[in-house]
């Protein structure tokens, strides 16, 4: 029998059909090779948008810099970065007038945070430009290297452990005439391989001391390394993103803390909240506009898109904003916050790895590093690349390009949102002084604008005024990519609104399935994803039940753990059948041991081990939850773990799931090949750093973060904490006298060893 597909939709309101339009099957595109070209594009484009600005030369680094601020007012619709200082300051003043005390209160909150934040805040985050080695490293390693070199150069304020003191060291380091650093270099030698008898190139890494003069150090401190943004769907061209170094990170963090605090108080801001909270906030703004427009007014909404948001923003503008926001605050606080925008006004973009050349005839490949682009003969390049290099050459110093205007992706999301909201705020009738008025939503570079007016001419006039006002602060609404609709239907940050936000369940599809961490985590993540989608994304009970059955099937195929009584033959089926036959209570076996699935949509919140515990044979319980099992290398299990799930687009999301430690929570061993390479030393450093941090966390569980103040090292802090805890435990009778004595003895030994060192 043929099914007419339209019948499926007869009873469905059209907005619910959005999940059938899902375009993102298959893997997203990843970038390969060098990002140098994309970075040059960014630098050249940014300068083009500000080309009518004034050129100056940085006295310290000799870098040529373009300043478009208070440049010519735009005469056409081309995107431009000529923000007018007085307009930005006025927008800030009006924002404060509409929200009395907002800046004052946010400053007070931030000041408190600034004084309490520890330097280990900077270990969060992924890849970071490590200025000591001139390449990217994990954040924790980059921070450790920076602090080590600061200390060896006599900068020791950071020993207090407060972030603000580390930043004092950063400031001082910039005044020093030179900095001595330890850097890595590679030696290559040709040796004969014992096994294959072929000649191979062996690489070893050496460490050497190197002096950087003031200019070289400043260039490194102001450098943002660049990479290609991966896994971006719906784009033909890749684009570059930036990773700043440790000198910039701390200052940016404090600015963003202040901006976040302001955003939390602004009803038009889509940051920093997310998910359902964000939807509720946005729905309020829409409701307000629609209620007012019921009788006499028309209401239209623009689903907005800005042209090259961050390439037209300017750090100098952010400096003006911060100067205004903090105007009544203590001098030290104003100084700390103004450093990030000042550093960004003087930033250098590192061009990345350079270009790879190969000669087909001679089977030769060679890499032209970015440092050589300044003076290499251009005849080797194609026309497109030639043009890029010619354009960027005047800006190059040591393989980095001077990039004063523009912000680079993802650096000041919160602060730029404040700027956007300040323009939305000007739409109130008391400011427009006419019959039209506007309001809207802003989240970083994404916006939705709702305009109300008595007639169509008024709507048009309102949109025009908004467009021009934005131009004055360096925001360029794209007329080509924005579209207007009757209020009630629009899109904002991938939320679709039609008489309320529509659950677009298909966006979550890529996160369904088996994650591939281990049997225990995968089961837990799988059911949690289904549970979360029932809560947040209108995943109905029937569909959820089906998703669950598909997931279990997928899980059994992944881990080859079909039920013990199945006919399917796999590598594991022999063992699993044997286990099935020996087990009295078969319902107690975990799915990964060939047991039945006991999950249904009512009990997804219970970890599988807990669900089946009462049903398990005793000896099975003993084997399953046995920390001494020699075949399993264990993670320490917190009650809640975090998994990274990938929605169809937007950033990877972190999702909490319950973790119960069993012999199935194994960790795959690290690939051995790295241990035989030059990277081994770095790996060992990292592991040691990890171990120290974990140990420290044991002594100071986050619930009791009364951190030791005025103690110069982690070791001293841990020893003093151990003594206090031991005394409390001894006095309350939790430990015996002998144990107490032993702890005290160990503490003394540690202190003795430190003194000898």
UniProtKB/Swiss-Prot annotation:
Residues 55-64 have a biased composition (Polar residues). GO terms for biological process: DNA-templated transcription; symbiont-mediated suppression of host gene expression; symbiont-mediated suppression of host mRNA transcription via inhibition of RNA polymerase II activity; viral RNA genome replication; viral transcription. A motif (Nuclear localization signal) lies at residues 187-195, 203-216. It is found in: Host nucleus; Host cytoplasm. Residues 249-256 are annotated as: Promoter-binding site. Phosphorylated by host PRKCA. Its main location: host cell. GO terms for cellular component: host cell cytoplasm; host cell nucleus. Keywords: Eukaryotic host gene expression shutoff by virus, Eukaryotic host transcription shutoff by virus, Host cytoplasm, Host gene expression shutoff by virus, Host nucleus, Host-virus interaction, Inhibition of host RNA polymerase II by virus, Nucleotide-binding, Nucleotidyltransferase, Phosphoprotein, RNA-directed RNA polymerase, Transferase, Viral RNA replication, Viral transcription. Residues 52-82 are annotated as: Disordered. Its EC number is 2.7.7.48. The keyword Nucleotidyltransferase applies. Residues 286-483 form the RdRp catalytic domain. It catalyses: RNA(n) + a ribonucleoside 5'-triphosphate = RNA(n+1) + diphosphate. GO terms for molecular function: nucleotide binding; RNA binding; RNA-directed RNA polymerase activity. RNA-dependent RNA polymerase which is responsible for replication and transcription of virus RNA segments. The transcription of viral mRNAs occurs by a unique mechanism called cap-snatching. 5' methylated caps of cellular mRNAs are cleaved after 10-13 nucleotides by PA. In turn, these short capped RNAs are used as primers by PB1 for transcription of viral mRNAs. During virus replication, PB1 initiates RNA synthesis and copy vRNA into complementary RNA (cRNA) which in turn serves as a template for the production of more vRNAs. Belongs to the influenza viruses polymerase PB1 family. Influenza RNA polymerase is composed of three subunits: PB1, PB2 and PA. Interacts (via N-terminus) with PA (via C-terminus). Interacts (via C-terminus) with PB2 (via N-terminus); this interaction is essential for transcription initiation. This is RNA-directed RNA polymerase catalytic subunit. It comes from Influenza A virus (strain A/Teal/China/2978.1/2002 H5N1 genotype W).
């Amino acid at each position: 029998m043929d099914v007419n597909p339209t019948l499926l939709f007869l009873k469905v309101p059209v907005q619910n059909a959005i999940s059938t339009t899902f375009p993102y099957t298959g893997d997203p595109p990843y970038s390969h090779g060098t990002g140098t070209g994309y970075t040059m594009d960014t630098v050249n484009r940014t300068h083009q948008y500000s080309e009518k600005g004034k050129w100056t030369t940085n006295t310290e680094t000799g870098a040529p810099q373009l300043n478009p601020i208070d440049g010519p007012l735009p005469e056409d619709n081309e995107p431009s970065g000529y923000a007018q200082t007085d307009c930005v300051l006025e927008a800030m003043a009006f924002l404060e007038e509409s929200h009395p005390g907002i800046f004052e209160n946010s400053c007070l909150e931030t000041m408190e945070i600034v004084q309490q934040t520890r330097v280990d805040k900077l270990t969060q985050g992924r890849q970071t430009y490590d200025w000591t080695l001139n390449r990217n490293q994990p954040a924790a390693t980059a921070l450790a290297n920076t602090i080590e070199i600061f200390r060896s150069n006599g900068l020791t304020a950071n020993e207090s452990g407060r972030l603000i003191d580390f930043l004092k060291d950063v400031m001082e380091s910039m005044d020093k005439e030179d900095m001595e650093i330890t850097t890595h270099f590679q030696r290559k030698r040709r040796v004969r391989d014992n096994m294959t008898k072929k000649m191979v190139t062996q690489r070893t890494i050496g460490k050497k001391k190197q002096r950087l003069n003031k200019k070289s150090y400043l260039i490194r401190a102001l450098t943002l390394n660049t990479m290609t943004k991966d896994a971006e769907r719906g784009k033909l061209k890749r684009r570059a993103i930036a990773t700043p170094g440790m000198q910039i990170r701390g200052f940016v963090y404090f600015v963003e803390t202040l901006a976040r605090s302001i955003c939390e108080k602004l009803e038009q801001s889509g940051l920093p909240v997310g998910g359902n909270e964000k939807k509720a906030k946005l729905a309020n703004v829409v409701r307000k506009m629609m209620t007012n427009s019921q009788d006499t007014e028309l209401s239209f909404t623009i689903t907005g898109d800005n042209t090259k948001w961050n390439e037209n923003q300017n750090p100098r503008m952010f400096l003006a904003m911060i100067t205004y926001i903090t105007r009544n605050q203590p001098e030290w606080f104003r100084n700390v916050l103004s450093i990030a925008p000042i550093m960004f006004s003087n930033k250098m973009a590192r061009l990345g790895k350079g270009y790879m050349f190969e000669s087909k005839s001679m089977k030769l490949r060679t890499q032209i590093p970015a440092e050589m682009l300044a003076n290499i003969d251009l005849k080797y390049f194609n026309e497109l690349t030639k043009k890029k290099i010619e354009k960027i050459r005047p800006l190059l110093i040591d393989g980095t390009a001077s990039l004063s205007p523009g912000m680079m992706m993802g650096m000041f999301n919160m602060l730029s949102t404040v700027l956007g909201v300040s323009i939305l705020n000007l739409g109130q009738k008391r400011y427009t002084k006419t019959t039209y008025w506007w309001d809207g939503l802003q989240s970083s570079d994404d916006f939705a604008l709702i305009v109300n007016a008595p007639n169509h001419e008024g709507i048009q006039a309102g949109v025009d005024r908004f467009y021009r006002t934005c131009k004055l602060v360096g925001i360029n609404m794209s007329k080509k990519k924005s579209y207007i609709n009757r209020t009630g239907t629009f899109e904002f940050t991938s939320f679709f609104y039609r008489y309320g936000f529509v659950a677009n369940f298909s966006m979550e599809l890529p996160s369904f399935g088996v994650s591939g961490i281990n049997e225990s985590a995968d089961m837990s993540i799988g059911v949690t994803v289904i549970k979360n989608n029932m809560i947040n994304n209108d995943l109905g009970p029937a569909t959820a039940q089906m998703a669950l059955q598909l997931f279990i099937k997928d899980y059994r195929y992944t881990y080859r753990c079909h039920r013990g009584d199945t006919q399917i033959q796999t590598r594991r089926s022999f063992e699993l059948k044997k286990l099935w036959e020996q087990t009295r209570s078969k319902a107690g076996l975990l799915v990964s041991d060939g047991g039945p699935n006991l999950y249904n949509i009512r009990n997804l919140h219970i970890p599988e081990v807990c669900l089946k515990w009462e049903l398990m044979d005793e000896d099975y319980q003993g084997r399953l939850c046995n920390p001494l099992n020699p075949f399993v290398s264990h993670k320490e299990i917190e009650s809640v773990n975090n998994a990274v799930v990938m929605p169809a687009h937007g950033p990877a999301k972190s999702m909490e799931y319950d973790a119960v430690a069993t012999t199935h929570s194994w960790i795959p061993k690290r690939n051995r090949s790295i241990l035989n390479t030059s990277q081994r030393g770095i790996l060992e450093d990292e592991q040691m750093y990890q171990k120290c941090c974990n140990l420290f966390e044991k002594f100071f569980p986050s619930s009791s973060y009364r951190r030791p103040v005025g103690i110069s090292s982690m070791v001293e802090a841990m020893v003093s904490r151990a003594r206090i805890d031991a005394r409390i435990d001894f006095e309350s009778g939790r430990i015996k006298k002998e144990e107490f004595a032993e702890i005290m003895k160990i503490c003394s030994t540690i202190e003795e060893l430190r003194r000898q060192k």
